[in-house]
Structure formats: C-alpha cells, structure tokens
C-alpha cells in the first residue's frame, strides 16, 4: 500500500509537469507568422445601410465598404452593379475586419478586363462574445436574415435576383451556415466560405443556448442537405479529388436535398490557430475543406486573427469569387454563377489545385532543342536561364521493376511542361522528336517552397501509362524560355524500395528508430505509411538529416495526408542547415470506429532535394504530443476540477478536528489526495455498462485514451491545490485588502458594510434573501459575485478571530506551563517552596479536568477546510456564469433582455449556502456515509456527462449544495423531533 501510494504521488507530479510543459510549448514554440499585411490604397469608408425591421436590434448595423470617395455613399439610393458579398464577423469581431478582403477585391476589379467587381457588405455585431454566450446567436442569426433581405431588395431591379456569397470568420461562419435552415433565405445563397469556424461543435460548450443553436442547425441541415460522413473504407489519400455526395447526387439527377445547390467551403488556419483547433473547422455538410498551409499560393499557417488580413489568403478567396462571377448579357451588372459543379471545380482549382481531367493535345515542330535521356536519374539545371524552348524525351521502356517515375520541374510556373508522346526520327538531324503530344499536367502537383523557386512534381506509374497509351514511346519535358534559373529532376525507381511501413510508437518508447540509414544520391520521393495513429494528440517526429549536399541550402517538402479526414492535407518545408531537420506528423480528428489504419494508414510523402543524401529516422514526440494534448483537451479541466472538489468535500464533510489544534488551522486538509483517480478508471468501465444497459442517458462519446484523462485529472488536482493555497493566503494576508476593494465596488460606507456583515454572520438567511433577490433582479452572475464576496469576508473574519484565539491560547499555555526559575540561592525560604508546590498541584488538577472533558470539535465556520472547498465550488459556479453576466452587463445600455441559462441552478446554490451558514454546518451527525456515496455518484456524473458539455457542471454543483443543506437540515430536524 505504501508503494502504491508513492507511485500514485509520482504519477500526479509527473502528469502535472507534463501539462505545464505542454502549455509552455504550445504558446512559446509557435512557427513564425509568414502572412503579408494587406494595405489599403485609399481611406477605408463604411456607409451605413438601413435595415428593414432593424429597430429591434439597436446595437447592430449593416455597412457597405468603399474606399477613397470623399462624399458619403448610400447603397439604398445608388444603383449597385457588383456581385453582393456579406462579411459576417465572429466572436468579439469587428465589422472593420472586412477591410482586407474588400480592399483586395477593389484592387483586383481595377485590373479586371471583363469589368467584374464585387460589392462588399459587413455587419456590426457590437463585438459580442458569441463563442462564450449562446444567447447572442439567435439574435445575430435573425439580424443576418434581415440583412440578406435588405441586400436582395437593393438588387431587386435586376431581371434575375442575384445570389449572395457569405464569408464568415470564427462564429460568423456558423451564423452563415445557420441561415440555411430557412429555405426562403437559403435559396438566395450561392456560396458560404467559413474561415477558422467551429462548424459542427463549439470550442467550449458553456451554456444550453449554445448547444441548442448547434443542435437545431444540425437537425435542419440533416434534412435539407446531404452529409458526408467518413466510413470504415474512406481513404481520401487514394482519391484526393473525389466529388462530395451532394454533387454526385446532383450530377446523377437523383433526388437531391433542397440545399445541395449551395456551395459550402470551410478553411482552417493550421498550427498557429490556438483558439479554434483544426479538427473543428470542417463540417459533414461541407463540399470542400482546406487548410491554409495546403492552399496553392498561400502555403502558410494563420492564427485566428491574421486569417482575416493575411494577404496571400485574401487573394486566394477573391481569386475564387472573381472566377465564379460573370457579367450579365446586357452588361448591366455582375452576378455569381449558379452552376454548383462548375463553381466547385473552380473552388478545387483555387483551394486544392486538383488534377485536371481534360487532356489537350499540343503540336510541336521538329525545330527546337530536342534531346533524349535514358538514364534513371537526371538533374538538369540551367543556371542562367534559357533563351529558347528546351525539349527532353524520356523513354518509357524500362526494366520491369522500374515502374515508378518522379519528375520535378523548378521555376516553371503555370505553363504545361509534362507530356506523353510517340517519338519519331527527324530525317534531317537524325534526332528523335514528337510532332504532337498529350498534356499530363493533370498528374502534376504544385509543392509549396516558401519564397524560393516554385516546385511542381508528378508521380507517374510507367506501367499504367504504357498500358493506357499503347502507342506512346516517351515522356516529354518542355522547359520554356526564362531569364531565371530553370531545370528539372528525374528519378525512376522500384516502388518497393521507396515505400516504408511503420507503426505508431507507443508513448513509453524512448528510443529513436531508424527509417532509412542513407538515401541514394538523386532520390526525389519517398513514402512513409504510418499505421495505428488514431488519437489527435499522438505525434511522431521525423528527422530528415542531410548528410551531404552540393548546395548549402536544400529543400525538403513533406505532405501529410490523413485518410479519414478530407481537406486536412498539410505541407511542411525544410530548407537550410540552420533549421532543425524535423517534421511532425499528427492527425486532426479521432479515427472513426472500426477503422482499419493498417489498410488505410496515414501517409507521409517526402519530396527530397536530389542533390543531397539523407538519414531519416523517427521517434515519439513527447513535446508535440503534450502541446497537442493541452490544445485538444484543456476544455476538460473544469469538469475534472469539480470532480476533485467533490471527492475532497466527501472526505472533509465527515472529518472534524478539535478546537485549538494546529490541524484545524489548515484549510488545505484533504487536498493532498489521489483517490479521485479511482473515479477516472471506474468511469471507463461504467461507461460501457451504461451504453450496454440502455437505461441511463448515453454518456458523451469521448473515446480517447485513458492517458488523456489521467493527465488532465492530475492537472486538476494541482490546480485545486494552488487554488486552496491561494485562498488560504488571501484569507490570512489580504482579507483587509479585499474588504476595501469590495467597499469601493459596492460604494458602501465602512459602517454600513460592518452592519451588513454582522447581520449576515448572525442571521445568514438574510444573506440568501439578498443574493437571490439580486440574481433574479439582475442576473445570476451578479448574485453569485455578491455571495462570493460576502462569504469570503465572513470566512476571513472567522479565520482571523480563530487564529487570534489560537495564538493567545498557545501563549497562555506556554506561560502557565513554564517551570518557575529554580533559585540557586542558599537563603531560599520554605514559604517559596510551599507556594511552588501549591501551584503545581493546581496545574495538575486543571490538566486532569481537561483530560476528563471531551474536546470541542470544529463546527460551523471553524471547519475552515470544509468552507474553503465550498468557497471554491461557489467560485467555479461564478466563473461558469461569467459569460452570461458579461452579456447582461453589455446589453443593459441598449435595454435588451437576454436569457439567463444558469439562473435556477444559481438560486439553488445561493439558497443552500445561506441555509448551511444558518445551520452552522457542518455539524457532527449521522448519515455522512450516504452523503459520501452521493458525492461519489456526482463525481462520476461529472466525468461521464460534463467534460464536453461544461454548462452541466452548474447543475452538478447545485446538486452538491442541495444535498449538503438537505442532510444538515434533516439531521437537526430529527434531533429536535427526537427530543420532543
């Protein structure tokens, strides 16, 4: 038992250190921001647009964006000819965030020969915290519908009513998606682009209003739109460009859902976005998802705020919008095309860069610089560029085992450079050439290379090419004239030598494992397939160490593909010896149930610099895994903290120390524990029983490793200890400071506050009446704040009084128990000896009387450890109500009444707390074993039902307070009845 206790303590300490290190690495070791700033070329101007029936939303507004015009512009009085786009800001977002998008569109319209231009509108939501308080969302959704109707009325003079594009950032993307639940509005929506939006579930589920908003949107869209759900056989790495089910049904003319004609595009910021993690940015109702690190000509990670001003990303979005817009036949206005399949292909070209299926035939003459290559490895560069077109023919007839070819072109932008053809002899020169050739650019993939020379590569199966095109004899590489360095690389190889299968290392695997001891010179491509990578916190560090390079700078591009997560393709780049030669591989979402990762592994494609030789190894990345664990699961911390407090309270409620002992002074009694870890393991088994029995509600579907729960729970234990010690210091040292702060906030005089504290200390029921009335008159958070302040001051005064009595008692005991000075004088009288003997006899008699009397137990406010735990639970309840309190505070100035989702649980907490103080709880009584069982059950409920749905914790805390007050009340009532 002693060994087990020591191991448990070490486990708690180790988990705490892991959590702190993961938190540190998450915020410190972040890749640099490579976004370029978007600058306005004219003064940004916002013209307010009057919204019909918008008077009921006094704090909202609709604006039209324009630049440079000195005179005010009113879209309602002016003929608008552009294609309408609405920008919807998100959590605490400003309507002015549209500037980057709209300014890029204005510049692009000036250089557009077709005359296409866009009209950008933006909504002012008063920078409301819509991600923290769900009561905002229904109001914002209703106002967005009014804005759409108003904008449609501006363009109602057209022969055809235009369709609108919605661009939403953060929670604005969810609002844009939610308007589709109204078919009357949905039929006017052309495309919705969401930027870093938690689409299918919120980042933190903090109240019932937020959960209801997501559930209602999901339920309606399930009926009106075709959903895409990964199955056991899904593998997007084998078919990256498969069409979504909605488009397939439309193309086959099956009975398609009503809203399948709306194109939904979602984007995620990648590793730099610490507010909305990548796994939340996709939706099962989407047609296309892309990470900014994989978008062509963007190829970087954006944090949550830079996603709305990153120039490369803004250009990509506007490039798509201009591609789907067209000028009407009468050239009177601009509109967005309504052919969804065509728009989707354009979106794929912009955000994914798909393989182009159409193959065009190009004719070449015999004139030109023609060459034939038969080598397996070719590295051909022209440092000073080319004055004319250069042709290289690569024979298809190879040995049987050399069936794969990787061909890379450098500094060839968008021109066709790869073809297949049937070569013939030139009668004049005797050289081979191709009269006509078929483009293979649909097999070419563009690779990000930061600001260096563009890379594009094609991976070809020579056997399939020979079978498909029997008459072909050669591949043709055409390099256009260029003043820059240009060239290409060729690597023909046996695919068995370039594919390596590995398993995800276990977390206890400490060693670095070899992958390739040394690559051959000229190696261009290598594929690594990783099985058993199933959890989003798991991470592998792949070390690509250059052993010898011709040039001081090299280039390695890694492409990571997760087979069950469409649109989460990511690229990473290594480019110099100064950079750490490491890549990180992880997955954005949990693997689907019963998914076989051996048949469909995570794929890591390594595109190497052929002028280098490399040593490649891999290991379990503890630093990356811990940072991802914190990022993915920090939302579980409140539930585990409440679980710890319940287990601590279960122990404290039946533990009574004697008055005057040192233990009674320690409010952290019970927090140095590890027994709450038993609840974590027990809930894993209990969850399976609940699911199989189908009697109780189904627990939250959080099928993660138990290691995650242990680390988060140990972090909660540490947090509870820190909170308790902080409360102890505040009670002891800073009680007066908090008292003065409370006086300044409440603006009460010291005499008045002293009277109120005295009344509430001696008659705590008035404390409950005051706080409950405040909660019902304002909001629950204000009542809880008032209760917390008074409870803290009452506890601080009681602790100071008790500490003062304790010190005086100890001092008196020392004085009484101090032996009289033994005089060494020989002339000491017998009277002094008799007096000393009399004093000793009196002290012995008093000591015997004290031993015979039963020691007094610490009850009421003297049981400080119990009340400190109640104070912390009240503080947790206050924090859970903070978003709704902020919403109430902001809405007061506009006279808006918003729902208070936690009012009733807060009233229960306030009433129970006042009753406990009135009864001087806790009292020594019977029945604490039943209360302990109830607290165990509540702790299990927290871990089964409240880790993701954080708002349910308010009901659990209210239940704990109610059980405590009911137990104390029934015992006192039973005692009085039994006396009668």
From Swiss-Prot:
Residue spans, topological domain Lumenal: 29-628, 731-774, 889-895, 951-954
Residues at the catalytic site = 170
| Cell membrane listed as a keyword | no
The record's Gene Ontology cellular component field reads: endoplasmic reticulum; endoplasmic reticulum membrane
User: Gene3D superfamilies given for it?
Assistant: alpha/beta hydrolase
Q: Where is the composition biased (Acidic residues)?
A: 824-834
State one Pfam family annotation: PGAP1_3rd
Which cellular compartments is it found in?
Endoplasmic reticulum membrane
Q: What does this protein do?
A: Involved in inositol deacylation of GPI-anchored proteins.
Identification of the protein by name: GPI inositol-deacylase
State the organism of origin. Answer: Drosophila melanogaster
């Amino acid at each position: 038992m002693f060994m087990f206790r020591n191991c448990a303590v070490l486990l708690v300490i180790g988990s705490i250190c892991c959590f702190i290190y993961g938190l540190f690495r998450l915020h410190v070791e972040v890749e640099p921001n490579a976004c370029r700033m978007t600058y306005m070329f004219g003064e940004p101007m916002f013209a307010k647009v009057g919204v019909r029936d918008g008077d009921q939303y006094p704090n909202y507004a609709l604006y039209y964006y324009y630049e440079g015009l000195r005179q005010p512009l009113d879209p309602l009085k002016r003929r608008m000819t552009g294609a309408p786009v609405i920008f919807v800001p998100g959590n605490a977002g400003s309507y002015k965030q549209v500037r980057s998008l709209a300014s890029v569109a204005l510049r692009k319209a000036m250089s557009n020969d077709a005359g296409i231009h866009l009209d950008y509108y933006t909504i002012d939501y008063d920078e409301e915290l819509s991600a923290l308080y769900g009561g905002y969302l229904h109001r914002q959704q209703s106002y967005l519908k009014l804005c759409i109707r108003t904008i449609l009325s501006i363009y109602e003079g057209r022969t055809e009513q235009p369709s609108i594009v919605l661009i939403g950032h953060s929670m604005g993307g969810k609002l844009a998606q939610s308007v589709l639940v109204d078919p009357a509005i949905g039929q006017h929506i052309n495309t919705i682009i969401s930027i870093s939006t938690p689409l299918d579930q919120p980042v933190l589920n903090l109240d019932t209003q937020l959960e209801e908003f997501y559930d209602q949107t999901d339920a309606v869209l399930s009926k009106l739109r075709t959903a895409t759900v990964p199955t056991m056989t899904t593998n997007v790495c084998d078919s990256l460009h498969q069409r979504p089910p909605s488009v397939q049904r439309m193309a086959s003319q099956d009975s398609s859902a009503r809203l399948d004609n709306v194109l939904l595009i979602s984007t995620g910021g990648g590793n730099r976005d610490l507010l909305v993690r990548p796994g939340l940015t996709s939706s099962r109702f989407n047609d296309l998802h892309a990470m900014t690190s994989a978008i062509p000509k963007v190829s970087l990670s954006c944090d949550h705020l830079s996603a709305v001003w990153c120039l490369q990303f803004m250009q990509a979005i506007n490039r798509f919008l201009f591609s789907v817009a067209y000028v009407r036949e009468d050239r009177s206005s601009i509109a967005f095309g309504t052919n969804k399949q065509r728009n989707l292909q354009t979106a794929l070209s912009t955000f994914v860069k798909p393989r182009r299926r159409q193959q065009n035939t190009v004719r070449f003459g015999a004139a030109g610089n023609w060459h034939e290559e038969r080598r397996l490895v070719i590295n051909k560069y022209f440092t000073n560029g080319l004055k004319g077109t250069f042709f290289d023919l690569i024979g298809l007839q190879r040995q049987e085992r050399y069936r794969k070819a990787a061909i890379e072109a450098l500094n060839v932008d968008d021109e066709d450079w790869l073809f297949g053809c049937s070569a013939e002899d030139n009668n004049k020169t005797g050289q081979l050439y191709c009269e006509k050739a078929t483009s293979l650019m649909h097999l070419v993939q563009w690779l990000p290379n930061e600001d260096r020379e563009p890379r594009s590569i094609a991976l070809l199966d020579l056997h399939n090419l020979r079978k498909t095109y029997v008459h072909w004899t050669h591949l043709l590489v055409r390099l256009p004239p260029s003043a820059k360095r240009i060239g290409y690389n060729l690597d023909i190889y046996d695919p068995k030598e370039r594919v390596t299968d590995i398993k995800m290392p276990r977390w206890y695997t400490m060693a670095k494992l070899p992958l390739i001891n040394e690559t051959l010179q000229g190696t261009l491509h290598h594929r690594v397939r990783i099985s058993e990578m199933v959890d989003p916190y798991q991470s592998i560090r792949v070390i690509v160490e250059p052993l010898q390079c011709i040039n001081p700078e090299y280039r390695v591009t890694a492409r990571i593909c997760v087979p069950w997560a469409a649109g989460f393709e990511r690229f990473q780049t290594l480019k110099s010896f100064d950079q750490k030669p490491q890549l990180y591989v992880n997955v954005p979402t949990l693997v689907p149930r019963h998914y076989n990762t051996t048949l469909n592994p995570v794929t890591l494609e390594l595109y190497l610099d052929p002028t280098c030789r490399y040593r490649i190894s891999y290991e379990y990345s503890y630093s990356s895994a811990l940072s991802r664990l914190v990022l993915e699961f920090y939302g579980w911390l409140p539930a585990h903290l409440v679980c710890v407090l319940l287990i601590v309270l279960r122990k404290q409620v039946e533990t009574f120390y004697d008055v005057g002992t040192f233990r009674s002074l320690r409010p952290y009694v019970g927090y140095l524990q590890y027994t709450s870890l038993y609840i974590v393991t027990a809930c894993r088994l209990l969850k399976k029983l609940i699911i199989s029995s189908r009697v109780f509600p189904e627990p939250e579907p959080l099928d993660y490793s138990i290691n995650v729960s242990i680390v988060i729970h140990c972090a909660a234990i540490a947090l509870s200890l820190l909170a308790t010690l902080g409360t102890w210091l505040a009670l002891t040292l800073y009680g007066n400071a908090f008292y003065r702060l409370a006086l300044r906030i409440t603006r009460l005089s010291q005499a008045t506050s002293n009277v109120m504290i005295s009344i509430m200390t001696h008659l705590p029921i008035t404390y409950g009446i005051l706080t409950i009335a405040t909660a019902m008159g304002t909001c629950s958070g204000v009542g809880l704040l008032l209760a917390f302040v008074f409870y803290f001051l009452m506890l601080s005064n009681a602790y100071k009084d008790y500490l003062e009595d304790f010190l005086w008692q100890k001092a008196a005991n020392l004085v009484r128990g101090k032996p009289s000075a033994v005089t060494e004088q020989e002339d000491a009288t017998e009277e002094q000896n008799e007096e000393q003997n009399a004093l000793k006899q009196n002290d012995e008699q008093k000591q015997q009387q004290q031993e015979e009397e039963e020691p007094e137990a610490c009850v009421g406010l003297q049981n400080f450890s119990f009340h400190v735990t109640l104070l912390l639970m009240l503080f947790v309840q206050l924090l859970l109500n903070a978003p709704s309190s902020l919403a109430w505070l902001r809405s007061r100035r506009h006279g808006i009444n918003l729902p208070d989702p936690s009012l009733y649980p807060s009233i229960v907490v306030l009433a129970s707390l006042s009753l406990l103080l009135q009864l001087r709880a806790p009292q020594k009584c019977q029945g604490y074993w039943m209360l302990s069982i109830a607290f165990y059950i509540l702790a299990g409920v927290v871990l089964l039902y409240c880790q993701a749905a954080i708002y349910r914790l308010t009901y659990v805390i209210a239940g704990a307070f109610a059980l405590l007050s009911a137990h104390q009340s029934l015992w006192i009532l039973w005692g009085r009845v039994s006396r009668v």
